[in-house]
């Protein structure tokens, strides 16, 4: 039989008393009153803050949005099918953060930056708040570097600078996403990190974009944030902010980034759904009163940072879908007033075979001209005016039977210039090739060709210049100017190739 020694027992008790530390843990807890449609009403949570993350009994995460006298309205980041009335809810004391880092490049993630491409976990370098404050006035500098899209009509007439916000707006099926993907593909071999945010799109459309970018070798420097049409409204609302946080990580390390929001109309609709279910008072088109702030606080995060902060930049290309070309609707007018210009895509132009279907007359870039390279300014200076005059004359010429020779010449030149701006999808052009293309048209070197021959002639000319006049390409690319030597070289190339083209 074991002998019990009192001194041994007393020493064990004494040891346990000495090691005891009193820890009081205060947890802010509430109870679910009602749940459904991605919304939960919670009783309790007395000290919860707006935007704070909540943890439900089944592990679902929510965000407290409505703080009322007797309950809290929260939106769920999940389907919430396992949440029941009476379940406990815990306030976490945190606001939404996402992991960020270099390893995200080439990956497809959801609105909480979790990988959804089946390629395993992503090693993060840190975290960033989903809702970060935008850089202040002192933290910024004016836009002065170009961001080349590879599309002649944009780079020549509606130039975009690094740190600018340029809206892409148009009806459905007018090529808005194509403009965005071409811009991403054109950054290949450069120093720009791209983030593409797909909001409320079909999963098949997102898969197609991933395939396009992979085939073009563009996924190496691209992150895709995707919340498809079947995702909860909360996640569709958060996706653009997650994309901005991922881009900000690179911007604050001194790098240039490009972020595309495709499209913000669907984010506004998701936010409207959440707000109406939370019983917030509806305003114009049933959107809540703070829908302008929804987009302004997102787009203000795009900036060109000052020297002290490393001169990084975030260029934003938000996309808005219009209904029947109506740009005076609520969301389009809001985003037009926030951004630094817009590229307007027209369904009529698209259907008549002009692609990209950019309506040059009502598209504008408010700050990009400061970023345009000198060579482009030299050759494209009159292009927009000539096309605007051509559009006016073309409308007039339908009613007039006899036109003088000068008008006929102007119409002929305009038709060739319009042909020059047509571009196949996923085939962006480098700056030197754009300069050569525009110069050929504006200087009348296409006037003696039939309109149907223009595109094949220009394609051949570009190949001829690359092969036989490589010094022209390097000269324009390095000096960013279009000097007399470059002009002579280009004139010679046009004359030489035209002889070959006509002979064939």
UniProtKB/Swiss-Prot annotation:
Q: State the Gene Ontology terms under molecular function.
A: ADP binding; ATP binding; proton-transporting ATP synthase activity, rotational mechanism
The reply on keyword Plastid is yes
**Is Plastid found in the keyword set?**
yes
Record localization = Plastid, Chloroplast thylakoid membrane
> EC no.?
7.1.2.2
What reaction gets catalysed by this protein?
ATP + H2O + 4 H(+)(in) = ADP + phosphate + 5 H(+)(out)
Q: Name the top EC class.
A: translocase
Q: Which residues bind ATP?
A: 170-177
> Which InterPro entries does the record cross-reference, listed alphabetically?
ATP_synth_asu-like_sf, ATP_synth_asu_C, ATP_synth_asu_C_sf, ATP_synth_F1_a_nt-bd_dom, ATP_synth_F1_asu, ATPase_a/bsu_AS, ATPase_F1/V1/A1_a/bsu_N, ATPase_F1/V1/A1_a/bsu_N_sf
This protein's GO cellular component annotations are: chloroplast thylakoid membrane; proton-transporting ATP synthase complex
Which CDD domains would you find in this protein's record? Answer: ATP-synt_F1_alpha_C, ATP-synt_F1_alpha_N, F1-ATPase_alpha_CD
What's one Pfam family here? Answer: ATP-synt_ab_C
Site positions per UniProt: Required for activity: 363
Q: Explain the purpose of this protein.
A: Produces ATP from ADP in the presence of a proton gradient across the membrane. The alpha chain is a regulatory subunit.
Give the UniProt family note. Belongs to the ATPase alpha/beta chains family.
Give the record's subunit note. Answer: F-type ATPases have 2 components, CF(1) - the catalytic core - and CF(0) - the membrane proton channel. CF(1) has five subunits: alpha(3), beta(3), gamma(1), delta(1), epsilon(1). CF(0) has four main subunits: a, b, b' and c.
Its name, as the record gives it, is ATP synthase subunit alpha, chloroplastic
Q: Which organism is it from?
A: Ostreococcus tauri
